């Protein structure tokens, strides 16, 4: 892609929107067992309902999902589009994970009001804190629109033409929903590798306020050390409230808004659970690749995962060093570090689990069975004889460039924040209404509040070195030629000059830059000019593998469909795609390896053990007042039958990223806790379900209520809840 063409096409806002949305993606990851699967609530078949009842489900299916009357799905929300949550009061209280609300807590924190360290409690509605960029989403209904979507395609279309036709129809169907009712959002998603399409109709609420957050010593206890691990003792929860207008309709933030009154409130149980108790999760899992070919898995391991491991490890080390030195930096960088390190450790664990559990061998065995079935089935042999060899060849063709793009995305698009600022500016729609332009600018200006130039410069130098060391010279963008010819190969000198001459390194400079310049002169800023150079290289690499990628998309779709035809008698569930899903199973212990037996719950006793074992480690530092409260043993009605305070528990529910904050219900639809993590031994779970070792980690609702009432002294929140206590 020619640089001049990029600059000349700057005024085509539609084109730039399409181009940069792809780049900016980098800124922002058959039921063979009764407990496997992320099921669509609106499409539960008889086999699934039967399996749930056999395991202990007591409530009828129409109480799980109904479009005619309030049901359990009406209490479950998508929280911000990246997590899940559950509505627990008539006045719109929402429980979600502490790590889901972490960014909001951080934005309200300062050195003087360190809510990350000390926690936050709103003792009145007036003290609840607004979060302008946060929303919750309720699912109203789902509808199969496969036939309508596929009518837009013809057999003679290329893969690119087919994709464009399908995307256009999906948008059209979704837009029809909001045109009929402006309070609704319609989204069509692809299922089963693009073989089916379903419409989901939602209602969004944009006024969501922070009500309660425990200190990070509770909500993040164990931090990176314990992340993805069991046994766990993390009180990973916080509380928000949904607000609406006086007619109970969605509304942007206003002091005149009132608490939202939901269709359905999830009841809470204090009865707890036992080994083998039924448990189901409801939430919004992000994405899985259960039907991906072995070739795709191998590419993921060596490309995206390895790039994330290598590059983020370097970047995070710089961040963490500075965060440990200064409280102001700790607060500024807390949220971005938390998000980055979460997926970094996930990638490490995923690659390790794929190897240890021999996932590739299992996939190849399934593919061998498919090959034989195709050869023995005349109707399939005619169409798919060369399917597997085509997959292998096309993945091989794009191997090196795909790997380079993974490192490119991590090193530059998701690396120095100055690059992110430049790309955001290039994506501004300057022809929009003034109100929208101002909103775009304000959103960018807000990012500077959590930005440190000195740290970002060090990150940039490290990213330049890391990328050069990991890819072939053919994949180096033009900036490396500049570094070598004008700066003698010295990355530090290049970065110093770049930041010294760019005006967008500070909010004041950005305002001055945008007020003075027109789009004609924007490329005069070296950071913006660099952004264009990176886009050119990005699309150059993308074009190199375009043909192979189109072929892979088609082959993977046909591979998915062929597997379902081969096992037509099996009950298949679709991969996760950020739509509401149900998973179910039982609470239970597990043995990950010889000599290790893990119980199905933990208690506060383990908190004291870890504090002692990890003395001096900030990941396990807990305030004396918290330890004193836990040591008192005054757990009241929140204690189990032995008088212990349970903290976390595990089930074999099938979850993934996005399920964080998902409600964990018993067979009566009563809240047991919130899902917040998976376990280390089954980090390959996005690719294959491992029934013997895969576990969903949840925080016990009784521990949550204990912390709210006893530590937060927020009994007014407890009084709002619908608590079922059969022990009385």
Regions found by a protein language model. Give the residues of each.
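Terminal presequence/propeptide segments associated with secretion/organelle targeting
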Residues: 29-728
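Bacterial Sec-dependent N-terminal signal peptides
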Residues: 1-36
